[in-house]
């Protein structure tokens, strides 16, 4: 039952996951990672937003990662943002700042702008929390 619910994926879901992982980029000294799937890629693979479930979690479980960001394009310069963290970053605070919500370790929001601008805006908030944690250590 667990395999069917959590692990079983279609071939195209596996393809888009592979692409997201392959094109992911680490930043903030390798403590954070992001990946983006564009609408054209979703169309190419014949997937919809439900097929993207779990990608952000696959990014989060990479060794050394504290915070993962996954974006998928919903329109021109419009992105659905999924945020996950392991132990330090409160992603609900970041999502709330941008009009979204969620929990301490899993949150999301919708943002406008280029991928570069969206990731820069999010990374500034992540960096702030990582700096605070460093100062308190």
Describe the predicted segments one by one:
Residues 1-97, 102-137:
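Hydrophobic helix-and-loop "lid/oligomerization" segment in the mid-to-C-terminal part
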């Amino acid at each position: 039952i667990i395999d069917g619910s959590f692990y079983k994926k279609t071939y195209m879901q596996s393809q888009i996951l592979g692409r997201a992982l392959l094109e992911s980029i680490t930043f903030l000294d390798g403590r954070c990672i992001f990946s983006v799937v564009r609408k054209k890629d979703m169309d190419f693979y014949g997937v919809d937003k439900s097929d993207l479930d779990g990608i952000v979690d696959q990014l989060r479980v990479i060794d050394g990662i504290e915070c993962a960001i996954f974006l998928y394009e919903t329109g021109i310069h419009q992105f659905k943002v999924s945020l996950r963290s392991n132990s330090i970053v409160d992603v609900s605070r970041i999502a709330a700042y941008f009009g979204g919500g969620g929990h301490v370790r899993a949150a999301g929001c919708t943002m406008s702008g280029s991928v570069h601008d969206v990731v820069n805006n999010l990374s500034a908030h992540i960096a702030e929390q990582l700096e605070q944690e460093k100062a308190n250590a």
